[in-house]
Design a protein with these regions (language model features):
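Residues forming the flavin
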Residues: 1-50, 56-185, 189-531
Length: 531
């Protein structure tokens, strides 16, 4: 297959025009072509005149001619499917492998192990998805939090209540495998070709449940409401684990807890394992009218039916730190994402249609090991302190209400909230607060500098009605559990740190890929347990 890139067309163009232009670029007659299709579609909104930019996949009737044809065209490349060959190991497992965590990393590790006959045992501290959705909705309506069933914990992990983005910067061939699995389990076909694919929280839930059911159909077991509470070791080798519901003998454990499993991190450190302090970020959720964002991005073309909902990704270096936007949710809402009592955490979520009035994105500033003397316990304590401050600042408006402030007020340190055209969407309600007072002064000032820079990139970013809601503290894991090149923990044989919580991923796609890598490492070393 040949990929013909940079096919630029006006918004009014249809797919057949892209196909014809691709064949013209290749200088190949249609009579020689077996198939054409869209491989990628993006929008170039620069210079105020948005264009559709296609990458077209072309398959010839004589595939042997494709290499020479692609070689003579600067905008073409020969695409060969990545080889995902698995080589089974010979060292017999005495016990079935255990996967701890059913977020993207654990889900895909368990799926690959199950497809190869390893019948994994999967432990998830939260409930199955239907019960989890009920718990989240109950918290949103009443402010009654279940610490093990919320937006952070339960089947699917934290990404289940998000925009369902499948974008990544890792460039791994396993991304195609992840996309195929999502498609096999009901994700919309467009994720295969959109430049910025997303599933949406509504559709993602069914996909996750379907993948879990495949794991079970292949002999895997899933134990919900079963938190990891301890490790059993002998001569530097993992030999078993303790959970809230009993013990399991195992010599391989995929440690794929999420970034909010603070009690589990503490258990590891208390048991003698050393965790590193890893960079993460803190800040707020910014809300604007989606229509205003699109006017700034698309100019006169805003509202054209060929254009996707407007998205942005901004960053600005301020001294030694970086202020950047994270998890931008077009047409979405800000959601209460606490997993601990009397702490407020914000996050963003949107449905597949992205039809809400507001755009939201985290606006955060980086912090790292030097801020905490490279002590992971201090980093976690910092997160908790900020979340407790946010809870106290919003408490007058109700349990888990959030502090909020207009962007202009934050820039001027006034602590005021005026509700105008932008209606805050945080589901537990908001109240006016001085957000700058909730953060260390240097971080607040750095965020202010970043926001001022954003106004130069997106007109209206600091508009009077724009709102900040706080605090955003769970952008990524604050810790990392070191592993070797074979993915085994440097401190304990048989323990496989994996995914976002262990410090090796950020987002659904990269976490899923890391789960596949870890599963592949186990498969290449061990033969399945008998019986």
């Amino acid at each position: 297959m040949i990929l013909v890139r940079n096919i630029r067309l006006p918004l009014s163009a249809a797919e057949p025009q892209a196909f014809e232009k691709a064949l013209h670029t290749l200088r190949v007659p249609r009579s020689k072509v077996e198939h054409t299709g869209v491989a990628k579609l993006s929008v170039d909104a620069r210079h105020g005149q948005p264009k559709l930019v296609y990458t077209v996949a072309v398959t010839l009737k004589q595939p042997g001619e494709e290499a020479a044809l692609a070689a003579r065209c600067p905008d073409a490349v020969l695409h060969r499917r990545a080889d995902f060959t698995l080589h089974a190991g010979t060292q017999p497992l005495a016990h079935r492998p255990v996967v701890c965590g059913l977020g993207p990393a654990g889900l895909f590790a368990a799926l690959l192990l199950a497809r190869q006959g390893y019948r994994p045992i999967v432990l998830e501290r939260g409930p199955a998805l239907d019960a989890r959705v009920q718990a989240v909705e109950h918290f949103s309506a009443t402010g009654q939090l279940d610490p093990n069933a919320n937006i952070q914990f339960g089947e699917g992990g934290a990404g289940t209540f998000s925009d369902g983005k499948l974008t990544t910067r890792i460039g791994d061939e396993l991304c195609d495998f992840v996309t195929e699995v999502f498609l096999q389990h009901g994700a919309p076909a467009e994720i295969a070709w959109k430049q910025k694919p997303h599933v949406g929280t509504d559709l993602l839930r069914g996909v996750i449940t379907s993948i879990r059911k495949e794991i079970e159909s292949l002999g895997g077991e899933v134990h919900f409401n079963t938190a990891l509470t301890g490790l059993e070791r002998k001569n530097g080798q993992l030999v078993g684990i303790a959970t809230a519901n009993g013990s399991f003998a195992c010599e391989t454990l995929v440690f794929a807890v999420g970034h909010s499993a603070r009690d589990t991190f503490s258990m590891l450190m208390d048991s003698g394992l050393v965790l590193e302090c890893k960079p993460f970020s803190v800040g707020f959720r910014a809300e604007h009218l989606q229509s205003e964002i699109e006017k700034s991005l698309y100019h006169e073309a805003a509202g054209h039916p060929a254009l996707p909902r407007g998205e942005y990704q901004l960053s600005q270096h301020v001294g030694d730190r970086c202020v950047y936007t994270f998890c931008m949710c077009p047409g979405g809402q800000v959601v209460a994402s606490a997993s601990e009592e009397e702490r407020v955490v914000t996050n963003g979520m949107s449905y597949h249609a992205r039809s809400g009035k507001n755009a939201n994105a985290a606006v955060v500033v980086s912090v790292g090991g030097a801020d905490f003397a490279n002590d992971p316990r201090r980093a976690i304590a910092f997160q908790r302190e900020l979340e407790a401050k946010a809870y106290a600042a919003g408490r007058a408006a109700g349990a888990y209400a959030a502090p909020a402030e207009n962007v202009q007020s934050f820039l001027e340190g006034r602590g005021q909230l005026h509700i105008g055209s932008v209606q805050p969407t945080y589901d537990r309600g908001v109240t006016a607060a001085d957000l700058g007072a909730l953060l260390p002064g240097e971080l607040a000032d750095t965020l202010r500098a970043g926001l001022r820079a954003y106004e130069r990139k997106i007109a209206g970013y600091t508009a009077p009605d724009a709102i900040l809601t706080g605090l955003e503290t769970r952008t990524s894991s604050p810790v990392r559990l070191k592993r070797e090149e074979d993915f085994v923990c440097t401190q304990l044989a048989g323990l496989y740190p994996c995914g976002e919580g262990a410090g090796y991923a950020g987002g659904i796609m990269s976490a899923a890929v890391d789960g596949l890598r870890v599963a592949r490492a186990i498969i290449s070393r061990y033969a399945p347990a008998e019986g």
